[in-house]
UniProtKB/Swiss-Prot annotation:
Keywords: Chloroplast, Membrane, Photosynthesis, Photosystem II, Plastid, Thylakoid, Transmembrane, Transmembrane helix
Subcellular location, record wording: Plastid, Chloroplast thylakoid membrane
Subunit structure: PSII is composed of 1 copy each of membrane proteins PsbA, PsbB, PsbC, PsbD, PsbE, PsbF, PsbH, PsbI, PsbJ, PsbK, PsbL, PsbM, PsbT, PsbX, PsbY, PsbZ, Psb30/Ycf12, peripheral proteins of the oxygen-evolving complex and a large number of cofactors. It forms dimeric complexes.
Signal peptide: none
Name of protein: Photosystem II reaction center protein Psb30
Origin species: Stigeoclonium helveticum
Family: Belongs to the Psb30/Ycf12 family.
Pfam families: PSII_Ycf12
Gene field: psb30
Residue stretches spanning the membrane: 6-26
Length: 34
């Protein structure tokens, strides 16, 4: 596995972890729950 693949996997993991809560907050705010 090259360094580029490791960096890409870390970026993908970070994106998933960051996008999960962001989507939940976005949907909640759209529904007016916040």
């Amino acid at each position: 596995m090259n360094n580029l693949e490791v960096v890409f996997q870390l970026m993908a993991l970070f994106f998933v972890l960051a996008a999960g809560p962001a989507v939940v907050v976005l949907v909640a705010s759209q529904k007016g729950n916040l």
